[in-house]
Amino acid sequence: MIRQADIITVLMSNNLEPALCSGIVLCEKIIREAGTNKFTLINCFNNFNSKGFPLMVRGFYGLVMVTNCKGTFDTINVALRIEQPQTGHVFFNSVGHVKLREDAVLQGNEVLEIPFQITPFQVSEPGVYSVVILIDNDPIGKRAFTV
C-alpha cells in the first residue's frame, strides 16, 4: 500500500503553479521494467528495527511521486533529504534532475515518479525521523519513519 505523504504546496518558480508530493514509498530495491518502463518496488517498509544503537542504516530506495506541475520545463530539480525533525540534522541528501522531452507540456494531472538511491547512514538513537522532498530547495512534502 502506498502511504500518502503530507501534502504541502510550493509555487513552481517557472510557471507559478503549485507542485504536490503525492507519495513517498521506501523499499529495499527498485527495478525499472525494460519493456514498459514501469517500476517494481521490492520489500516496501515504514520503519527500521534495531536491538541497539548507534545503528548503521543499510542502503535502500525511495520512490517519490510529484504531481500538479503545469507548463513546460527543461528540467525539474527534486531533492530527497533524511533528517531529524527536532534538530534539523540532515543524515542524507540527494538531488535528482528530472529531464523532460522538449515537446512535453505538463497539464498538471501527470504523476512524475522519481526513484532515489539512499546510501547508508548512521542513526545514534531511536526516534521518529523525516523524509523530506524539495523542488528547487522548497519543501513540498514529507513523511515520517521510525527507527
Regions found by a protein language model. Give the residues of each.
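N-terminal amphipathic/basic-hydrophobic helices that include classical n-h-c signal peptides
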Residues: M1-L11
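Contiguous segments within soluble domain cores/interaction surfaces
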Residues: V10-Q122, S130-I135, P139-V147
